[in-house]
């Protein structure tokens, strides 16, 4: 009896020890640290935040001759709503513009001529400034365009983040052709679509970084000279012929080369860009009633701005119309 008691006690102690070890292992497996490491219980990684207007770089191309005639109109209207996102690229210093725009006025060393090299020089400056900004989208417009920031943001948000995007309005109903120089004095005929710069276009950063070998620094002008085409065509050439990308055509961009009167008033708030000018000898503007007369507002941009932003201080109040 005295010999069995220690054996029974030892067995009981051994059983308790095993149970204690199992319990300890169980609690270790359920510790907060282990729960966080369990794949099934991990929180999903949040994706990039939704695109905001401050993620977009808007470049306006102009020249000294249009500083007063065109730019002041833009500064009074849509640029007043996108001042932090908008950069104006010109060929000559302007004290008045400098006071209004500060560092957002970029004076290039480009010629004031309306030639392929001069236009490509300014586009190269726009592209390089965008790359240095770190922003998510590059949008180019001319100084006769009205940009609707709400419609622009709605359009850009619709594109998948993981895709290369080149969106704008082609000016032709067919691809353009170019002769691409080859070794041994040969040439190769290539064809591609491009978005006309006169209506504006946008490129996301993912695509812009891939374009850098042909578009950054002096290489954009070199590429333009190689195919003997202007800046907007060169953009399309790089994207489609060098990178295998594709233009996403959008009817929401407009230039003065189309019949703008065909747009109904109800459609205007949906358009990303609008324009004005003389086409085939006639004034080509959107059809929009008031609040300013055609004599007061020949471009109709001020009336359009009041339609989109009736709270603008210089817009006539609703009760006074």
UniProtKB/Swiss-Prot annotation:
Its EC number is 2.4.1.222. The gene is MFNG. It comes from Pan troglodytes (Chimpanzee). Residues 28-321 are lumenal. This is Beta-1,3-N-acetylglucosaminyltransferase manic fringe. Disulfide bonds join 110-121, 139-202, 306-315. Keywords: Developmental protein, Disulfide bond, Glycoprotein, Glycosyltransferase, Golgi apparatus, Manganese, Membrane, Metal-binding, Signal-anchor, Transferase, Transmembrane, Transmembrane helix. Gene3D superfamilies: 3.90.550.50. InterPro entries: Fringe, Fringe-like_glycosylTrfase. The chain crosses the membrane at residues 8-27. Belongs to the glycosyltransferase 31 family. It holds the Pfam family Fringe. It catalyses: 3-O-(alpha-L-fucosyl)-L-threonyl-[EGF-like domain protein] + UDP-N-acetyl-alpha-D-glucosamine = 3-O-(N-acetyl-beta-D-glucosaminyl-(1->3)-alpha-L-fucosyl)-L-threonyl-[EGF-like domain protein] + UDP + H(+); 3-O-(alpha-L-fucosyl)-L-seryl-[EGF-like domain protein] + UDP-N-acetyl-alpha-D-glucosamine = 3-O-(N-acetyl-beta-D-glucosaminyl-(1->3)-alpha-L-fucosyl)-L-seryl-[EGF-like domain protein] + UDP + H(+). It is found in: Golgi apparatus membrane. Mn(2+) binds at residues 144, 256. Its cofactor is Mn(2+). Residues 1-7 are cytoplasmic. Glycosyltransferase that initiates the elongation of O-linked fucose residues attached to EGF-like repeats in the extracellular domain of Notch molecules. Modulates NOTCH1 activity by modifying O-fucose residues at specific EGF-like domains resulting in inhibition of NOTCH1 activation by JAG1 and enhancement of NOTCH1 activation by DLL1 via an increase in its binding to DLL1. One of its GO terms (biological process) is regulation of Notch signaling pathway. The active site is at residue 232. It is a single-pass type II membrane protein. GO terms for molecular function: metal ion binding; O-fucosylpeptide 3-beta-N-acetylglucosaminyltransferase activity. It comes from the Eukaryota. Has some activity with cobalt, magnesium and calcium, but not zinc.
């Amino acid at each position: 009896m005295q010999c069995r008691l220690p054996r029974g006690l030892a067995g009981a102690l051994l059983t308790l020890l095993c149970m204690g070890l199992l319990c300890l292992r169980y609690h270790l497996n359920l510790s907060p640290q282990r729960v966080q490491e369990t794949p099934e219980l991990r929180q999903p990684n949040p994706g990039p935040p939704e695109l905001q207007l401050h993620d977009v770089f808007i470049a306006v191309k102009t020249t000294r001759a249009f500083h007063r005639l065109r730019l002041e109109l833009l500064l009074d209207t849509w640029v007043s709503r996108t001042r932090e996102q908008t950069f104006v690229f010109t060929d000559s210093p302007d004290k008045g513009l400098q006071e209004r725009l500060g560092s957002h006025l970029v004076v290039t060393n480009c010629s004031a001529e309306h030639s392929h090299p001069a236009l490509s020089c300014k586009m190269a400056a726009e592209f390089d400034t965008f790359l240095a900004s770190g922003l998510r989208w590059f949008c180019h417009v001319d100084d006769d365009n009205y940009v609707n920031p709400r419609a622009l943001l709605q359009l850009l948000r619709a594109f998948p983040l993981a895709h290369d995007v080149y969106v704008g309005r082609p000016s032709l109903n067919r691809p353009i052709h170019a002769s691409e120089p080859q070794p041994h004095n040969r040439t190769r005929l290539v064809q591609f679509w491009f978005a006309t710069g006169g209506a504006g276009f946008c490129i996301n950063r993912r695509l812009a970084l891939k374009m850098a070998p042909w578009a950054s620094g002096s290489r954009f002008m070199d590429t333009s000279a190689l195919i003997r085409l202007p800046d907007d065509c060169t953009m399309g050439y790089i994207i489609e012929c060098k990178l295998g990308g594709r233009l996403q055509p959008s009817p929401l961009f407009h230039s003065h080369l189309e019949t703008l009167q065909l747009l109904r008033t109800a459609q205007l708030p949906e358009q990303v860009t609008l324009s004005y000018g003389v086409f085939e000898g006639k004034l080509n503007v959107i059809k929009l009633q008031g609040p300013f007369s055609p004599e007061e507002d020949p471009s109709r941009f001020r009336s359009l701005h009041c339609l989109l932003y009736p709270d603008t201080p210089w817009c006539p109040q609703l009760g006074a119309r």
